[in-house]
A protein has these predicted regions:
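Domain-scale terminal segments
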Residues: 1-170
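Cys/His-clustered metal-coordination modules, chiefly Zn-binding fingers
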Residues: 178-261
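Surface-exposed cleft-lining segments at the edges of enzyme active sites
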Residues: 170-176
Protein backbone atom coordinates (compact mmCIF):
# COMPACT_ATOMS: atom_id res chain seq x y z
CA UNK A 1 0.00 0.00 0.00
CA UNK A 2 1.06 3.59 -0.56
CA UNK A 3 1.96 6.32 1.92
CA UNK A 4 0.84 9.80 0.89
CA UNK A 5 0.97 13.30 2.31
CA UNK A 6 -1.95 15.68 1.84
CA UNK A 7 -0.84 19.28 2.31
CA UNK A 8 -3.32 21.91 3.51
CA UNK A 9 -1.83 25.36 2.84
CA UNK A 10 -3.79 28.32 4.27
CA UNK A 11 -4.96 30.78 1.61
CA UNK A 12 -4.55 33.63 4.11
CA UNK A 13 -3.43 33.81 7.71
CA UNK A 14 -5.86 31.87 9.91
CA UNK A 15 -6.00 30.62 13.46
CA UNK A 16 -6.02 26.84 13.79
CA UNK A 17 -9.21 26.59 15.81
CA UNK A 18 -12.15 24.19 15.76
CA UNK A 19 -13.93 26.09 12.98
CA UNK A 20 -10.99 25.80 10.58
CA UNK A 21 -9.60 22.39 11.60
CA UNK A 22 -12.83 20.43 12.02
CA UNK A 23 -13.59 20.31 8.25
CA UNK A 24 -10.16 18.69 7.72
CA UNK A 25 -10.87 16.02 10.32
CA UNK A 26 -14.30 15.47 8.78
CA UNK A 27 -12.75 15.19 5.31
CA UNK A 28 -10.20 12.60 6.49
CA UNK A 29 -12.87 10.70 8.41
CA UNK A 30 -15.09 10.53 5.34
CA UNK A 31 -12.20 9.29 3.20
CA UNK A 32 -11.74 6.49 5.74
CA UNK A 33 -15.45 5.67 5.92
CA UNK A 34 -15.57 5.48 2.13
CA UNK A 35 -12.63 3.06 2.04
CA UNK A 36 -10.24 5.48 0.32
CA UNK A 37 -7.67 5.62 3.14
CA UNK A 38 -6.81 3.44 6.12
CA UNK A 39 -7.61 4.48 9.67
CA UNK A 40 -4.01 5.23 10.65
CA UNK A 41 -4.10 8.82 9.38
CA UNK A 42 -2.44 11.66 11.31
CA UNK A 43 -2.65 15.45 11.07
CA UNK A 44 0.63 17.34 11.57
CA UNK A 45 1.17 21.08 11.94
CA UNK A 46 4.25 22.71 10.40
CA UNK A 47 5.37 26.26 9.65
CA UNK A 48 3.71 26.29 6.22
CA UNK A 49 0.38 24.72 7.11
CA UNK A 50 -0.91 21.25 7.89
CA UNK A 51 -0.03 17.79 6.61
CA UNK A 52 -2.18 14.69 6.73
CA UNK A 53 -0.08 11.52 6.65
CA UNK A 54 -2.25 8.78 5.17
CA UNK A 55 -2.10 5.26 3.75
CA UNK A 56 -3.94 4.53 0.50
CA UNK A 57 -5.02 1.03 -0.54
CA UNK A 58 -3.84 1.83 -4.07
CA UNK A 59 -2.77 4.71 -6.29
CA UNK A 60 -6.30 5.42 -7.55
CA UNK A 61 -8.01 5.97 -4.20
CA UNK A 62 -7.85 9.78 -4.09
CA UNK A 63 -9.19 10.34 -7.60
CA UNK A 64 -12.29 12.62 -7.48
CA UNK A 65 -14.48 10.04 -9.22
CA UNK A 66 -14.06 7.76 -6.19
CA UNK A 67 -15.37 10.35 -3.72
CA UNK A 68 -18.81 10.01 -2.20
CA UNK A 69 -21.11 12.91 -1.35
CA UNK A 70 -19.61 13.35 2.14
CA UNK A 71 -16.00 13.45 0.93
CA UNK A 72 -16.94 16.10 -1.63
CA UNK A 73 -18.92 18.08 0.93
CA UNK A 74 -16.09 18.36 3.44
CA UNK A 75 -13.40 18.80 0.80
CA UNK A 76 -15.33 21.84 -0.43
CA UNK A 77 -15.47 23.16 3.14
CA UNK A 78 -11.71 22.63 3.56
CA UNK A 79 -10.99 24.50 0.32
CA UNK A 80 -12.70 27.60 1.66
CA UNK A 81 -9.59 28.17 3.81
CA UNK A 82 -6.87 25.91 2.36
CA UNK A 83 -5.23 24.94 -0.90
CA UNK A 84 -5.10 21.15 -1.00
CA UNK A 85 -2.49 18.98 -2.72
CA UNK A 86 -1.24 15.40 -2.34
CA UNK A 87 2.20 13.83 -2.66
CA UNK A 88 3.29 10.19 -2.93
CA UNK A 89 5.84 9.35 -0.21
CA UNK A 90 6.52 5.68 -0.90
CA UNK A 91 5.31 2.21 -0.11
CA UNK A 92 3.96 1.61 3.39
CA UNK A 93 5.82 -1.55 4.39
CA UNK A 94 3.35 -2.31 7.19
CA UNK A 95 0.74 -3.42 4.66
CA UNK A 96 0.52 -5.81 1.72
CA UNK A 97 -0.54 -4.70 -1.73
CA UNK A 98 -4.27 -4.62 -2.47
CA UNK A 99 -6.12 -6.73 -5.01
CA UNK A 100 -5.62 -5.57 -8.59
CA UNK A 101 -7.85 -8.17 -10.27
CA UNK A 102 -10.16 -6.65 -12.88
CA UNK A 103 -13.17 -8.82 -12.02
CA UNK A 104 -12.84 -11.21 -9.06
CA UNK A 105 -14.96 -14.35 -9.48
CA UNK A 106 -15.86 -14.40 -5.75
CA UNK A 107 -15.25 -12.51 -2.53
CA UNK A 108 -14.82 -13.28 1.17
CA UNK A 109 -15.53 -11.23 4.30
CA UNK A 110 -12.54 -11.74 6.59
CA UNK A 111 -10.58 -9.86 9.23
CA UNK A 112 -8.69 -10.43 12.48
CA UNK A 113 -7.15 -8.38 15.28
CA UNK A 114 -3.96 -7.68 13.31
CA UNK A 115 -5.46 -6.35 10.09
CA UNK A 116 -6.34 -2.76 9.23
CA UNK A 117 -6.88 -3.32 5.51
CA UNK A 118 -10.31 -3.73 3.94
CA UNK A 119 -12.14 -6.82 5.29
CA UNK A 120 -13.21 -7.74 1.75
CA UNK A 121 -10.85 -10.34 0.26
CA UNK A 122 -10.63 -11.29 -3.42
CA UNK A 123 -11.38 -14.98 -3.88
CA UNK A 124 -8.91 -15.24 -6.77
CA UNK A 125 -5.73 -13.55 -5.50
CA UNK A 126 -6.48 -13.57 -1.77
CA UNK A 127 -5.64 -9.88 -1.30
CA UNK A 128 -7.76 -7.15 0.27
CA UNK A 129 -10.17 -5.33 -2.06
CA UNK A 130 -10.31 -1.57 -1.41
CA UNK A 131 -13.78 -0.71 -0.15
CA UNK A 132 -14.08 2.36 -2.36
CA UNK A 133 -14.17 0.00 -5.37
CA UNK A 134 -17.32 -1.69 -4.06
CA UNK A 135 -20.90 -0.39 -4.13
CA UNK A 136 -22.40 1.03 -0.97
CA UNK A 137 -24.80 -1.28 0.85
CA UNK A 138 -27.24 -1.30 3.77
CA UNK A 139 -28.96 1.88 2.54
CA UNK A 140 -25.84 3.94 3.19
CA UNK A 141 -23.74 6.31 1.08
CA UNK A 142 -20.50 5.13 2.70
CA UNK A 143 -18.94 1.90 4.03
CA UNK A 144 -19.10 2.71 7.73
CA UNK A 145 -21.38 -0.26 8.44
CA UNK A 146 -18.79 -2.67 7.03
CA UNK A 147 -16.01 -0.92 8.95
CA UNK A 148 -18.14 -1.03 12.10
CA UNK A 149 -18.51 -4.80 11.75
CA UNK A 150 -14.74 -5.06 11.24
CA UNK A 151 -14.07 -3.04 14.40
CA UNK A 152 -16.45 -5.25 16.42
CA UNK A 153 -14.83 -8.43 15.06
CA UNK A 154 -11.30 -7.19 15.82
CA UNK A 155 -12.30 -6.27 19.37
CA UNK A 156 -13.81 -9.72 19.86
CA UNK A 157 -10.70 -11.38 18.44
CA UNK A 158 -8.40 -9.41 20.75
CA UNK A 159 -10.43 -10.47 23.80
CA UNK A 160 -10.30 -14.12 22.68
CA UNK A 161 -6.56 -13.92 21.93
CA UNK A 162 -5.89 -12.72 25.47
CA UNK A 163 -8.09 -15.48 26.92
CA UNK A 164 -10.84 -13.12 28.07
CA UNK A 165 -14.44 -14.38 27.94
CA UNK A 166 -13.25 -17.36 25.89
CA UNK A 167 -16.59 -19.08 25.40
CA UNK A 168 -18.46 -15.92 24.43
CA UNK A 169 -15.79 -14.54 22.10
CA UNK A 170 -15.11 -17.90 20.43
CA UNK A 171 -18.81 -18.44 19.80
CA UNK A 172 -19.16 -14.99 18.25
CA UNK A 173 -16.46 -15.79 15.68
CA UNK A 174 -17.16 -19.51 15.19
CA UNK A 175 -20.94 -19.95 15.34
CA UNK A 176 -22.74 -18.85 12.15
CA UNK A 177 -25.79 -18.08 14.31
CA UNK A 178 -23.98 -15.65 16.64
CA UNK A 179 -24.84 -11.96 16.36
CA UNK A 180 -21.39 -11.09 15.00
CA UNK A 181 -21.60 -13.81 12.35
CA UNK A 182 -25.17 -12.94 11.37
CA UNK A 183 -24.18 -9.30 10.93
CA UNK A 184 -21.27 -10.41 8.73
CA UNK A 185 -23.46 -12.76 6.71
CA UNK A 186 -25.94 -9.92 6.15
CA UNK A 187 -23.09 -7.81 4.77
CA UNK A 188 -22.11 -10.65 2.44
CA UNK A 189 -25.68 -11.04 1.18
CA UNK A 190 -26.02 -7.30 0.59
CA UNK A 191 -22.79 -7.17 -1.41
CA UNK A 192 -23.74 -10.25 -3.43
CA UNK A 193 -27.07 -8.65 -4.36
CA UNK A 194 -25.28 -5.51 -5.56
CA UNK A 195 -22.26 -7.11 -7.27
CA UNK A 196 -23.82 -10.31 -8.57
CA UNK A 197 -20.80 -12.41 -7.53
CA UNK A 198 -20.63 -15.05 -4.74
CA UNK A 199 -19.78 -13.49 -1.38
CA UNK A 200 -18.62 -15.84 1.40
CA UNK A 201 -18.33 -15.40 5.16
CA UNK A 202 -15.22 -16.74 6.92
CA UNK A 203 -15.81 -18.82 10.05
CA UNK A 204 -13.06 -18.90 12.66
CA UNK A 205 -12.01 -22.15 14.35
CA UNK A 206 -9.14 -22.83 16.74
CA UNK A 207 -9.46 -26.61 16.41
CA UNK A 208 -9.83 -28.90 13.42
CA UNK A 209 -12.85 -27.87 11.37
CA UNK A 210 -15.57 -30.48 10.96
CA UNK A 211 -16.10 -31.98 7.51
CA UNK A 212 -19.76 -30.99 7.46
CA UNK A 213 -21.03 -27.45 6.95
CA UNK A 214 -22.35 -26.14 10.30
CA UNK A 215 -25.55 -24.90 8.65
CA UNK A 216 -26.65 -27.42 6.01
CA UNK A 217 -24.56 -30.41 7.21
CA UNK A 218 -23.19 -31.12 3.71
CA UNK A 219 -19.58 -32.07 2.97
CA UNK A 220 -17.82 -28.73 2.45
CA UNK A 221 -14.17 -29.83 2.39
CA UNK A 222 -12.31 -28.74 -0.76
CA UNK A 223 -10.58 -31.66 -2.49
CA UNK A 224 -7.74 -31.18 -4.98
CA UNK A 225 -8.46 -27.59 -5.97
CA UNK A 226 -5.70 -25.13 -5.07
CA UNK A 227 -7.17 -22.33 -2.99
CA UNK A 228 -6.39 -20.41 0.20
CA UNK A 229 -9.31 -21.86 2.17
CA UNK A 230 -9.84 -25.52 3.05
CA UNK A 231 -13.63 -25.56 3.36
CA UNK A 232 -16.26 -23.88 1.21
CA UNK A 233 -20.03 -24.30 1.18
CA UNK A 234 -21.52 -22.86 -2.00
CA UNK A 235 -25.06 -23.19 -0.66
CA UNK A 236 -24.54 -21.42 2.67
CA UNK A 237 -21.80 -19.09 1.43
CA UNK A 238 -19.38 -20.09 4.22
CA UNK A 239 -15.62 -20.70 4.10
CA UNK A 240 -13.11 -21.88 6.71
CA UNK A 241 -9.60 -23.25 7.19
CA UNK A 242 -8.66 -26.57 8.80
CA UNK A 243 -7.52 -24.47 11.74
CA UNK A 244 -7.65 -20.68 11.71
CA UNK A 245 -4.10 -19.42 11.44
CA UNK A 246 -4.03 -16.92 14.26
CA UNK A 247 -4.58 -16.58 17.97
CA UNK A 248 -0.98 -16.62 19.21
CA UNK A 249 0.69 -13.23 19.56
CA UNK A 250 4.13 -13.97 18.15
CA UNK A 251 4.05 -12.42 14.69
CA UNK A 252 1.98 -9.56 13.34
CA UNK A 253 2.28 -10.66 9.72
CA UNK A 254 -1.21 -10.58 8.19
CA UNK A 255 -2.94 -13.85 7.56
CA UNK A 256 -4.13 -12.57 4.26
CA UNK A 257 -0.95 -14.14 2.90
CA UNK A 258 -1.54 -17.74 1.87
CA UNK A 259 -3.13 -16.05 -0.92
CA UNK A 260 -4.20 -14.60 1.93
CA UNK A 261 -0.80 -16.39 1.71
Amino acid sequence: MNAYKITFTPKTYIDYNDDTIEPIWNYLGCLYKNGQILKNYELVENKDGLWALITLPDGEALKPENNNIYVNKYLAAVKEHFNVSSEFLGRNMNHDESCSCQEPSWYMLYTDWMLSESPIVCGDCGKAVPLYKLPHILQSDEHYGVLGWQAAYKSTDILWTYCLSDRFTFRQMHDPKSQLSMDGISICKAFEEKIGKPFFYYLFNNERTKKMCPICDSDWKIYGEKTFVDYKCETCRLVADKTSKRGVIVNTEPIIKKGRV
